[in-house]
Amino acid sequence: MNQSLLTPFGTAIERVEAALTSLRQGQGVLVVDDEDRENEGDLIYSAQSLTNEQMALLIRECSGIVCLCLTDERIKQLDLPPMVEDNSSQYGTAFTVSIEAKVGVTTGVSAADRVTTIKAAIADNAVPEDLARPGHVYPLRAQSGGVFSRRGHTEGTIDLMLLAGLKPAGVLCEITNPDGTMARLPEIIQFGQQHNLPVLTIEDIVEYRKVTMEKAS
């Protein structure tokens, strides 16, 4: 990854701080993973403040596969089994069965319906019976150690929410180019500038967590 492209967004610590500010204000962030991994950028929002307009942007500008990142505790609370028993995906992305809210949706596929499903799944008193299976929202189970355990967008999302003091649940979707190909760093930065979204990397989150842990010790 050409880190020099990220220079306008500040240092790693400054990039994370900008992302946390954006999330606290109910806005989104763009997170890029390692070049030797997926080498993709995800548009990420806090699940608790997600709006219909933000969901529409995810559907319109991204891959359309909108995922809900949840902690292992929340996955257990909702009794969501893995999508498959033997996960053979290249990076072990922990998809569960897809979900739909049982109340307040029509076909489940519209932006408003997907937001309704997400709000139902993250409600404090949510129970398995609140959700139909399958559906049009794809939960992902984050590993408990965050980016220290797995350098994925799922864990990065949960880490960012916790660092921002928000409910540990986030929504993500991969950024794609208009021709359907996956966006790389130059296109992701351009997208961020177009939509006034901060850009950071998984490595930035790793570094930020290390620094904050050292300060706390």
Curated annotation (Swiss-Prot):
The record marks 136, 174 as: Essential for catalytic activity. GO terms for biological process: riboflavin biosynthetic process. One of its GO terms (cellular component) is cytosol. Mg(2+) 2 binds at residues 38, 153. PANTHER family: 3,4-DIHYDROXY-2-BUTANONE 4-PHOSPHATE SYNTHASE, GTP CYCLOHYDROLASE II-RELATED. Belongs to the DHBP synthase family. This is 3,4-dihydroxy-2-butanone 4-phosphate synthase. It comes from Shewanella woodyi (strain ATCC 51908 / MS32). The lineage of its organism: Bacteria, Pseudomonadati, Pseudomonadota, Gammaproteobacteria, Alteromonadales.
